[in-house]
C-alpha cells in the first residue's frame, strides 16, 4: 500500500490530535526507525521520551512474550508476582515508600492530585485549599493534569478546569513564596521542564521549594515522567539535587512502549 493511502485512511478514521508528519513508520531496531517506503531514520524523539531501551529490544520482547503466555491481566483484587517485583525495584532505586501503578503519565498525575486532595481533606483544610503549579509546565491533557499545566493555549478550550490552582514562575523562588499560604496543600512541578525546551530546576530553587513545603506542611510532588528513568544521568533527576519529594510521578521510559 502506498504511503498516501495510509494517510488518507488515517484522516478518515482517526481523530486529529496532532498535525502529523507525512511519514508512516513500519518498524524499528535499536535507535533506528523504518517507514513503509523503506527509508531509514535515526530516532532522536524516542516516541516522546518513551523508548528508553530502543526498538525491538530482545529483553523487552522476551519478557512481554513470557508474561503474555502466562497471565496478560489480573485486577487489583488479587496479587501477582510481576507487579510486586516491579514495585520493589522502583522503591529500591527511588527510596520512596509505596508504589501506585497507573496506565499512563497523565493518569499518574491524576493520582498525585488525588493524593494532594486527600491529604488536604485528612488535615481538615477548608475546601478552598490551593495547589501551586508552575508556568510553562506540562503535566498531561486529562482534566486534572491540564489544570496544573501552565499554558493558556492548552487550557482555554477546556475551561473551567479544577479551581484553586496558583501558578508561579519556575526557578523564581520569590514567586513561589508569594503564593504560599495556610491554604497551600501541595506544590507540583517538573524537576526539569520539557515544554518548549529543556529547563532544569536550579539547586537553589528546588531546595527552596522543598523548604517552603516543609515549613507549611505541604506536599512536594515532582513530575519525572519525561526526565526520569535515567534520562538525566541519575535514575530520577531530583536525586542529583539532594532533595526528596513526597510524591513522584514516572512513566514513559518506565514501560518502553509496552
Feature-to-residue mapping (PLM):
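Conserved N-terminal phosphate-binding loop of PLP-dependent enzymes in the Aspartate aminotransferase
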Residues: 1-258
Amino acid at each position: 500500500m502506498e504511503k498516501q493511502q495510509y494517510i488518507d485512511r488515517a484522516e478518515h478514521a482517526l481523530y486529529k490530535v496532532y498535525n502529523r508528519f507525512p511519514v508512516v513508520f513500519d518498524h524499528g531496531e535499536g535507535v533506528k526507525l523504518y517507514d513503509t517506503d523503506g527509508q531509514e531514520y535515526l530516532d532522536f524523539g524516542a516516541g516522546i521520551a518513551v523508548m528508553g531501551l530502543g526498538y525491538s529490544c530482545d529483553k523487552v520482547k522476551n519478557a512481554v512474550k513470557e508474561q503474555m503466555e502466562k497471565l496478560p491481566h489480573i485486577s487489583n483484587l488479587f496479587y501477582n508476582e510481576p507487579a510486586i517485583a516491579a514495585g520493589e525495584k522502583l522503591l529500591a532505586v527511588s527510596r520512596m515508600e509505596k508504589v501506585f501503578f497507573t496506565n499512563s503519565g497523565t493518569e499518574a498525575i491524576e493520582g498525585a492530585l488525588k493524593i494532594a486532595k486527600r491529604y488536604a481533606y485528612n488535615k481538615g483544610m477548608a475546601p478552598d485549599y490551593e495547589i501551586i503549579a508552575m508556568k510553562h509546565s506540562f503535566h498531561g491533557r486529562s482534566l486534572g493534569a491540564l489544570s496544573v499545566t501552565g499554558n493558556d493555549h492548552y487550557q482555554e478550550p477546556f475551561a473551567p478546569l479544577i479551581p484553586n490552582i496558583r501558578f508561579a514562575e519556575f526557578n523564581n523562588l520569590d514567586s513561589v513564596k508569594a503564593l504560599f499560604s495556610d491554604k497551600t496543600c501541595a506544590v507540583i512541578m517538573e524537576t526539569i521542564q520539557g515544554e518548549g525546551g529543556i529547563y532544569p530546576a536550579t539547586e537553589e530553587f528546588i531546595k527552596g521549594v522543598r523548604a517552603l513545603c516543609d515549613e507549611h506542611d505541604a506536599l512536594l510532588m515532582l513530575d519525572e515522567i519525561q526526565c526520569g528513568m535515567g534520562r538525566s544521568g541519575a535514575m530520577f533527576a531530583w536525586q542529583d539535587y539532594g532533595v526528596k519529594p513526597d510524591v513522584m510521578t514516572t512513566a514513559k521510559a518506565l514501560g518502553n512502549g509496552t
